């Protein structure tokens, strides 16, 4: 069993290896980053999601984006608390984060978690936290449009069948459907849509704080249903843009005993593994 302090030490060591600036250090030098990378609880503490964090940091560094993280000053956005009905805890967490962000004068935020994205963008303003918030799919799309990121010949995934799962908090809650698909286009892969996609997409089963509780009794768990829809497209890869969706779809693939033939990746991982970062070295 590992303590929170030990986990934070490990995370600090990983951050140093990845060349991740910390906001407090920049502020001490009177510097302001172009954007604050909000890592989120999953991206900080979940081993699978940490790989997504690392991939996105690689993209930011490769594209020479001026960014920073809050490090140990970053707290949970409070999304799970509010979804579970604990409004007091949500407002307490939000107030602490807003005080930190406003104290640094932060205006631009990017995050790899749609839950953090939705909360920071749509729920913090009523509490005094007004920021320009982007999901990493939007940010990567912007880097591609600016010519800072490209992939000649499609890279590693050229010709592979990829199906993309729409996160509820990115898609239906915020209308972000095209950005992740535009990012996938530079892979020159075959993008195959599920029968329920975009505004009609099916939840992975982790939304509304369901990630942190046991499923109610029923005929089938939601993530199994959703994964079956994904597998119907006969994909080589299931692409996700949310740490919760990534976990649920991965579990669904394991349930179907397809983990050897079907992989679940975040879009940032696909960009890195597709060798997009080598084109500008």
Regions found by a protein language model. Give the residues of each.
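Iron-sulfur cluster-binding electron-transfer modules in prokaryotic oxidoreductases
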Residues: 1-281
């Amino acid at each position: 069993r590992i303590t929170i302090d030990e986990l934070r030490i490990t995370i600090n060591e990983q951050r140093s290896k990845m060349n991740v600036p910390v906001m407090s250090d920049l502020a001490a030098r009177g510097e302001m980053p172009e954007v604050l990378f909000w890592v989120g609880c999953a991206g900080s503490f979940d081993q699978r999601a940490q790989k997504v964090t690392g991939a996105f940091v690689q993209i930011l560094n490769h594209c020479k984006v001026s960014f920073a993280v809050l490090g140990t000053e970053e707290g949970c956005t409070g999304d799970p608390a509010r979804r579970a009905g604990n409004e007091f805890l949500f407002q307490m967490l939000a107030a602490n984060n807003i005080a930190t962000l406003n104290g640094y004068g932060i205006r631009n935020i990017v995050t790899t978690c749609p839950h953090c994205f939705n909360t920071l963008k749509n729920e913090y303003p009523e509490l005094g936290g007004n920021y320009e918030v982007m999901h990493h799919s939007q940010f990567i799309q912007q880097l591609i449009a600016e010519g800072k990121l490209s992939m000649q010949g499609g890279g590693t995934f050229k010709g592979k069948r990829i199906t993309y799962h729409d996160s509820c908090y990115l898609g239906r809650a915020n209308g972000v459907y095209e950005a992740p698909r535009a990012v996938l286009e530079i892979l020159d892969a075959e993008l195959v849509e599920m029968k329920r996609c975009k505004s009609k997409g099916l939840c992975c089963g982790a939304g509304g704080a369901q990630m942190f509780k046991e499923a109610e009794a029923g005929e089938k768990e939601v993530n199994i249903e959703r994964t079956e829809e994904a597998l119907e497209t006969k994909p080589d890869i299931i692409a996700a843009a949310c740490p919760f969706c990534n976990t649920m779809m991965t579990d669904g693939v394991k349930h179907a005993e397809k983990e050897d033939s079907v992989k679940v990746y975040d879009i940032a991982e696909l960009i890195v593994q597709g060798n997009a970062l080598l084109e500008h070295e």
